[in-house]
Amino acid sequence: KDIQVSGHAIECRIYAEDPLNDFAPNPGKITGYRSPGGPGVRLDSGVYMNYTIPTFYDSMISKLVTWGRTRDDSIARMKRALSEYIILGVKTTIPFHKAILRNPNFISGDLNTHFIDQYKNGIESEMVNVIAEDLENVNKMKSTFMPSKKIAAISAAVGSYLNTAKNQQMNKK
């Protein structure tokens, strides 16, 4: 009979577009990719590492949806999901969504159909901050996962140890 509200959902459409350049399409090859997940997170996408965003079609990469019992829960999940979402090689609308989710008027639900135009300057300056933070985080991740001689030596030693132990077990039988 009556429709009952049972939580809140937010959808962010992720496009290969440059939000600081009037959302101009940004086709190209995805050189790094990690999708978000977890409770209350849904991702509808067809892209993957080394996928090429074509110039001839819609530049949509994915639809990222979060659900929570409250608006605040849904916003928190979307912030987390966007922070986990890594797409390298093309510019995306992820910084735009992160900037919107930091806007106090969005958080409080003080919205109207002119929201983006009303807060354009603040959103753009926040996107610049987001992009700088994301770049710093990507550089940290790169240095964390760079192969090192110590790691290679330890990996080789562990592999050798496991093979020796396996062979000794086989010889006992």
Language-model features and meaning:
Residues 1-173:
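Catalytic cores of soluble metabolic enzymes centered on carboxylation/carboxyl-transfer
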